[in-house]
Amino acid sequence: HRDLPQNEINKIKTALAHEIDAAVTDGFTCFMSGFADGVDQYFVELVLERKQTTPALELIAVIPYRKRLDSLNKKTRTRELLEACADVVVIQEKYLPSVYSHRNRYMVEHSDRVIAVYDGRETGGTAKTIRFTHRMKKELREIPVGEIVLPDHLKPKTK
């Protein structure tokens, strides 16, 4: 979700804040983020803001591979966010095309509730993660973004 339209970002942050607050109200204290640019890092910032008033909250960074962690640590802002995490999990040492799927699978397997920002596309990492969340029978909180892309079979018929 690095390519989000600017006008959607504030709406997404508001919706993420709402879902985080709802999770805290429901008793959740541990949150995970894959630390991708964009939505993942907005989520991190919002959880860490809430940690200031709710010290029991924990954030775990789930990083797909070692060089990604190295590149995050080179930027002051993301290094500070990582340092504020209770734990940093690196899924595998070397990059392989499947690293992001493995990271997402790890987060779903270790979660009771998944919060997903989703544009409705049937392909891609978010769609795959949502399908896996359903298969694992985990609770899913979906935040729609942008123009929702409808699959062809759901589009209105035009004459």
What positions do the PLM features span?
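Acidic/glycine-enriched connector segments
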Residues: 1-157
